[in-house]
Amino acid sequence: MDNQHNLNKSNESFQEFDKQRVQELEHIYVTGTSINDYSGSTNKAALKMILSQRETPQAITVITNQMMQDWQTINIDKILEHATGFYARRSASLDRPRFSVRGGNVNLIQIDGVQQFPGGRRPNVNGDSAAYERVEIVRGANGLLTGAGDPTATVNLVRKRATNTDFQANFGLSAGRWDNYRGDIDLSGALVDDGTIRARFVAAHYDKKSYIERYGQQKSSIYTTVEADLTDYTLLRLGVEYADTASEGAINSHSQPYFFSDGSRYNGKRGDTGMTAKWSGWPLEEYTYFIGLDHAFDNDWQLNVIATYNTIEMQGGELFFVYPQSPINPDGTSDLGFDYSAVISSSKDQQSTFDISLQGPITLFNRTHEVIISYNKFNRERTSYGKDADQTTISLQNLNFHEWTGDVPRYPFKDLAKQNVSITKSNGGFAAVRINPHDLVKVIMGARISSWDYHSDSYDTITGEFKKMQYQETVTDEITPYAGLVVDINERYSLYASYTEAFRPQAYFDENDKMLAPSTGASYEIGVKGELLKDTLNFTTAIYKNVENGLAEPDPNFSEKYLTPNGNRPYVQRGEGDTTKGFEIEFTGSINPNWNLSAGYSQHKTQSKEGDQLDTDEPNKLLNIYTTYDFNHYLAGFTAGVGVNWQNSFYATPQRPLSNRQSEAHRIEQSSITLINLMARYEINNKTSISLNINNLLDKHYYNSISSWNGYVLHGEPVSWQLGIRYSL
């Protein structure tokens, strides 16, 4: 009877309860005080409203700071490998993985809820994860916040906040296999006695080699932020992020051949790689400046404003690699010899963003509802420097794949000149309302209107003069709807359903040289969410369908030789494209105060409109289980954990060379595999702890990626370890 009364309380009681809930969630969200567990109880990633996972009508994963510390995930790409349904394909480079989820690529990255353009801030370019409190992931389309995108997932990185407590300091050092060294420092505290002005400083540096021969990377990052309470209801935030990344050696050719020229197998070491010069280097330097203002009004409405300016600069990236003109022979030679590619590149990205939102309660029909109105703007300019002609030719004699060491003279690159300037502009606004028609029912409805423009200009690298506009795309007043429903079954479980969209501009033109409308990606999702074990363990199960509509196809009324007056081949839009259907289940949080758990299983199938299965060269069934237990009752200060990663088989069908210089289709398959990871931590005292992490404990041999084109493969990482020590004040 008491439970029934709680579920059907009056609207006046609901208003007071909801107000208290919002205040509590705001405190947890802002301060990051989600205790030492894996729950990630609140998020703003889906709607910018502070909602619990159960209140959000989409599948959400939150990687908490505790989980990042337990498993020593120092890079964003490593963090995402712990997320349900995410697969990291490292076909070309360990630095630049391509993440896929729900049958498509993940391209949308946000920082503190503000969108970063692909290329403006990617998981592989990002600085050390030390600057972030947690990572929030929304699976499915998220066009309400972003407009342009894919119906896959959005990743939101949440920065650490300054604390208003006494001075705190945290220092860490670690060393691992392949000369992997790292150090970090995290300082925070009040700058004045009453805590109204406070600051945080985070810095990290690592230097590592790899199981891949002739490859290494160094990365330094700094993050500092200052917060000031201008009034009891107004908060000002300022901050700077800096990241300096230098990769060297085998930067972009980590895969190795699967076949020799006669069709026999190449059985090399897992670290064998392409023929890249040791001196190849790819330096990136990044600065991000941000300022934010938050204000709470007397009527419980909130104003949030944030502006950022970001630059990524590469000065003199040099890449030199050799490749065979024909398949490699068993003795390491090539019948047609070897050629080389020499690339020197510099670029500068400048990106500015502005985001403002206003949200709060309204009363309608004697019930309280929540409304949010938001506007955001993104501008990005990328300048590339290169050289079109007058490249020096060098001679490489008597090359052999088996004997390649990377010790070649430095290539005499020419001076660079401006080659290309591309400008992207995007702006849009959205409005959404969380309607409360019944104490057990919440309906979310919203829509976004977006404009998007991209154009690229080329320049003569000899004279430096403007040559022509190479490319232009424009989208105006694109509408993106959002609809969600959450129904509470009881105090523990809720049913939810959602329909979300995103759009993608298309650089295709019809017979009249008019650019086609954007394609749209739609996500249909239903599921059940729960808060188990006294609300300490989150549970989600979801069934979804992603559909791409309005994809461009060649106009069947014109021959392939026909071109429009501007030299374009005519295209038309043909309705439905690829379809992905899938299922996910996830548990995150704590089973009891000593036992943390993050477990997720996903499976999907992607088909073309003709019914052909796509993406067979990646696993479509993934299981991640990460759990830790604090043995304090048995051995004071000792925590241990195990991680399990399972994936099903996948395959590619490249062309296998034959001895007569012919070829035939040949299937290369990676069977299903289970990887075991371990962690252990011992607190020597209340200030000092030591830790050990072991990945791929059983040293399983497997392929991370298989090329459908030439059959080249990249081996997964062998067993590795990392030993760390941490000291706190």
Locate predicted features.
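Outer-membrane beta-barrel translocator/receptor signature
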Residues: 118, 131-133, 144-224, 230-234, ...
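Membrane-embedded beta-barrel scaffold of Gram-negative outer-membrane proteins
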Residues: 294-298, 302-308, 312-318, 495-496, ...
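Gram-negative outer-membrane beta-barrel transporters
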Residues: 439-440, 545-547, 572-655, 698-699, ...
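Acidic/polar loop-and-plug regions of large Gram-negative outer-membrane beta-barrel proteins
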Residues: 206-210, 223-229, 233-296, 311-349, ...
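C-terminal beta-signal and adjacent terminal beta-strands/loops
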Residues: 646-657, 681-729
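Acidic, small-polar-rich N-terminal luminal/periplasmic segments of exported/outer-membrane proteins
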Residues: 4-7, 17-166, 526
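Structural signature of Gram-negative outer-membrane beta-barrels, strongest in the C-terminal barrel
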Residues: 229-231, 349-351, 368-380, 387, ...
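Face-selective signature of the C-terminal outer-membrane beta-barrel domain
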Residues: 289-311, 340-459
